[in-house]
From Swiss-Prot:
This is Probable transcriptional regulatory protein PMI1113. Keywords: Cytoplasm, DNA-binding, Transcription, Transcription regulation. SUPFAM superfamilies: YebC-like (SSF75625). It comes from the Bacteria. The lineage of its organism: Bacteria, Pseudomonadati, Pseudomonadota, Gammaproteobacteria, Enterobacterales. PANTHER family: TRANSCRIPTIONAL REGULATORY PROTEIN YEBC-RELATED (PTHR12532:SF6), TRANSLATIONAL ACTIVATOR OF CYTOCHROME C OXIDASE 1 (PTHR12532). GO terms for molecular function: DNA binding. It comes from Proteus mirabilis (strain HI4320). Signal peptide: none annotated.
Length: 251
C-alpha cells in the first residue's frame, strides 16, 4: 500500500526482501515498457509513464535500466502483448481488494489470482464489486524529520489535494492523478526529497482487522504479489497500534 499507514509499515520488511530478489524491479520494468508502448516514451506527455518513472527512482533503479525499459516500450515491440487487467474481490475479514495485473495470458492470470483468494478464505468478485470503495490518487510520501509546515505549505501551493501527517513525523501528500507529476516536480524543486511517489488506489472506508485476520490478509497479499503478472495489490485493511506491534513481533 502507498503512504505511511500502519499497515504499510508492517510491509516494509517484505518489500525489502522482494527488492533483493529483484521482483520489484521486474514488475516496474514491465510497467515502464507497457506505459511507453501505450503512451509514448516521453514522461512529460505520458502520465502513466511518469508515475512508473517516479516509482522506479523511488526504488533506486538506475537511470540506465530505466531508460532501456522505456526505449524497449517506445520501440513498439510486436512481441510485447501485455494488457492491464483489474480483478476485484473480498479478502479475510471482509476486506476489499483490488489486484492490478499486466498479463499476456488472461487465463493464467485469473487462475493465479483466484487461487490466492480461495486459499486464504477470500472470494474473487465481479467488475465493480469493490472498485467503488477506492479513488485513484497520487501519493508522495516523506520520511520523518522533514519540516511539516514547510511541506504542507509547498504541497498546497503546488496544487495538492490534501496533506496527511503522522505521529512519527512522516507525511503523505495526496494529489489528483492528473496533477501528480506537476506537484512532484514542484516539491522536488522546493528541495523536498520524497521517500516514495506513486499513483495508487486509496480506500474511502477501512476494514479493521484483528490479530487473527491480519496475517491472513498478509498471506493473500504475499501470494498475489508472488505472481509475476500482479503489479499492485490495493486493499482497505486497517490495523490498530496494538495489532501492528503484535505483527511486528511475529514477522
Amino acid at each position: 500500500m502507498a503512504g505511511h499507514s500502519k499497515w504499510a509499515n508492517t510491509k516494509h520488511r517484505k518489500a525489502a526482501q522482494d527488492a533483493k530478489r529483484g521482483k520489484i524491479f521486474t514488475k516496474i520494468i514491465r510497467e515502464l515498457v507497457t506505459a511507453a508502448r501505450l503512451g509514448g516514451g516521453d514522461p512529460a506527455t505520458n502520465p502513466r509513464l511518469r508515475a512508473a518513472v517516479d516509482k522506479a527512482l523511488s526504488n533506486n533503479m538506475t537511470r540506465d535500466t530505466l531508460n532501456r525499459a522505456i526505449a524497449r516500450g517506445a520501440g513498439n515491440d510486436e512481441n510485447d502483448n501485455m494488457e492491464t487487467i483489474i480483478y476485484e474481490g473480498y479478502g479475510p475479514g471482509g476486506t476489499a481488494v483490488m489486484v492490478e495485473c499486466l498479463s499476456d495470458n488472461r487465463n493464467r492470470t485469473v487462475s493465479d489470482v483466484r487461487h490466492a483468494f480461495t486459499k486464504t478464505g477470500g472470494n474473487l468478485g465481479t467488475d465493480g464489486s469493490v472498485s467503488y470503495l477506492f479513488t485513484k490518487k497520487g501519493v508522495i510520501s516523506y520520511a520523518p524529520g522533514v519540516d511539516e509546515d514547510a511541506v504542507m505549505e509547498a504541497a498546497l501551493e503546488a496544487g495538492a489535494e490534501d496533506v496527511e501527517t503522522y505521529d512519527d513525523g512522516a507525511i503523505d501528500v495526496y494529489t489528483t492523478p492528473e496533477a501528480f507529476g506537476e506537484v512532484k516536480d514542484a516539491m522536488d524543486a522546493a528541495g523536498f526529497v520524497a521517500e516514495s511517489a506513486e499513483v495508487s488506489m486509496i480506500p474511502s472506508t477501512k476494514a479493521e482487522l484483528d490479530i487473527d485476520t491480519a496475517p491472513k490478509l498478509m498471506r493473500l497479499i504475499d501470494m498475489l504479489e508472488d505472481s509475476d503478472d500482479v503489479q499492485e495489490v490495493y486493499h482497505n485493511g486497517d490495523i490498530s497500534d496494538e495489532v501492528a506491534k503484535q505483527l511486528e513481533d511475529i514477522l
